[in-house]
Amino acid sequence: MSFVVGVGGSGSGSGGDGGGSHHHDGSETDRKKKRYHRHTAQQIQRLESSFKECPHPDEKQRNQLSRELGLAPRQIKFWFQNRRTQLKAQHERADNSALKAENDKIRCENIAIREALKHAICPNCGGPPVSEDPYFDEQKLRIENAHLREELERMSTIASKYMGRPISQLSTLHPMHISPLDLSMTSLTGCGPFGHGPSLDFDLLPGSSMAVGPNNNLQSQPNLAISDMDKPIMTGIALTAMEELLRLLQTNEPLWTRTDGCRDILNLGSYENVFPRSSNRGKNQNFRVEASRSSGIVFMNAMALVDMFMDCVKWTELFPSIIAASKTLAVISSGMGGTHEGALHLLYEEMEVLSPLVATREFCELRYCQQTEQGSWIVVNVSYDLPQFVSHSQSYRFPSGCLIQDMPNGYSKVTWVEHIETEEKELVHELYREIIHRGIAFGADRWVTTLQRMCERFASLSVPASSSRDLGGVILSPEGKRSMMRLAQRMISNYCLSVSRSNNTRSTVVSELNEVGIRVTAHKSPEPNGTVLCAATTFWLPNSPQNVFNFLKDERTRPQWDVLSNGNAVQEVAHISNGSHPGNCISVLRGSNATHSNNMLILQESSTDSSGAFVVYSPVDLAALNIAMSGEDPSYIPLLSSGFTISPDGNGSNSEQGGASTSSGRASASGSLITVGFQIMVSNLPTAKLNMESVETVNNLIGTTVHQIKTALSGPTASTTA
């Protein structure tokens, strides 16, 4: 076979040296003057043999071939690019044919199974098949379970009168092994609906039903069918985006300007000159552009990172504080040779800042993965205009993503570019205006920092749980440590969804931001089963994020802010380190004055990095905790996550200017933004309806907590602006 190659090097692709942009920017006269020729049979034969040995030759190999064959190095480079593209197309056609045949086979089997189900009969009772709508059956079973619990409580009360002692109720959890915690742990007193404190199980008012809001039209859909006409268009958009991202990753000035001594900000004027656009994207005066670049070293190899980036479930777990929702809508290409090289996915994604004051950003985008050279991968995201996509936020993602380069000892260097155009339909709250307008809240540095912290967390799994930093050797096995970390990860994800303004959480806004900035939502939870209220607010403190983090994570200072502890001391009885910073850990806490009649403990994870910190906790039953510590699946352990996220307020650069007062009542000196979120079980009845008394109670709870934190950290004269 032969390829037509221009003498001027204007073949397909641009290797990051600007060849592709010259091809597009050249005038009609220049294109007519370019001369083309075909390679000789001997040249092609030599190139083919070299391609079989190494499809990705380096510069030294390309120069050697250039001397042997009498061709320019650029011609060698473009020949290999074209050959790889042709080989990829051949593999894709073969894969598509095989997938189509397999799809036809599965479709026939599906039809046969559906027909068989229509005539299915239960072998035990001879009855008809199950209902086609399991929702009502599930609700009926939950109501029956609630009645059975009431009957059990009534019978236990009657039996206790005759036996002269209380009868312990049956545990709803599976049998478990005895843990060392059994001998050392009691529980917190006065922990609300989990102990003997004030209950939120009120008489529910009729007519105040809580309807679950529908998800986004794309988020709730199954995989979309992409036509054969659209696939080449998507592939072309992805390849163009990859070329642009490579230029942005590899070029410094004048495209990028260094600010704050460490952040790279895109020079929009230079960008428009290098990447002129025929559309109005990036030119609308009503839109604001945020573009930044950052890099860092992470403790994970490139292939493992690529695997996580191309899996939406793992992607969401990797960035729980940034990604509110992520779903693969269609797989246009699954990659080559069992890897993600050439993989192209169509995604729905929603980005968040952990605060009820900041709206989320929704994107329908293409994610493309390509190996640039041995040990180096590029993952690019770019918005795609899909007719079915109706966005609540007018946001567009220009070519963004990262370059991942393998380094020795299992490390990788990650260089990240984030380039977003957004329209602010509502005025950004003054607390977050600075960090959002400066591109910090959704910027590249936050992505890299979060990735570094999460990779460090994953790496801690290889550290034995009985290290000197663990207390008492409670976590005895690697399986137990892994199970505890999975439980804590689910707790964090649950908390992040409860405090953000995601459009895709299955919840109802009960009370929008009131006069003190508290937002209350309600949803039906499977674990624990029932109706859950979520309340969240954000407030400012003049203290540094690290000081606030140290105060909130320390069990010795917990009674100063934890309303539900009733001022009782708390002690740490188990500890798992999951990072180099001493504050990055998972803890199990108990009340020092608790009695053995209440077996409720507190599971807590704290984490800090340069972008911020969080302290998240949840009451957990002792029996359930034993399940996790024995290494069993913790997926069904009930969790009601509460906690705090702490981030810089973005005014660090102003701290030397005297801290002039602003209209919000807070000084412009560096401080912290704290988001506090509580989740409380209102009722264990699946058909429960909500009353306003429970909303008022949770508002009072969160308001009291905020006041006590401000009093403890800022003193009586501190700012009270929320």
Curated annotation (Swiss-Prot):
Biased composition of type Gly residues is found at: 1-19
Q: Which cysteines are joined by disulfide bonds?
A: none
Q: Which residues bind DNA?
A: 32-91
Which SMART domains does the UniProt entry name for this protein?
A: HOX (SM00389), START (SM00234)
| Coiled-coil segments | 81-161
GO terms for cellular component: nucleus
Looking up PANTHER family in the UniProt record yields:
HOMEOBOX-LEUCINE ZIPPER PROTEIN HDG11, HOMEOBOX-LEUCINE ZIPPER PROTEIN MERISTEM L1
Q: What else is known?
A: The gain-of-function mutant edt1 (T-DNA tagging) exhibit enhanced drought tolerance, increased root system development, reduced leaf stomatal density, increased levels of abscisic acid and prolamine, increased resistance to oxidative stress and high levels of superoxide dismutase.
Q: What is this protein called?
A: Homeobox-leucine zipper protein HDG11
Q: Which gene encodes it?
A: HDG11
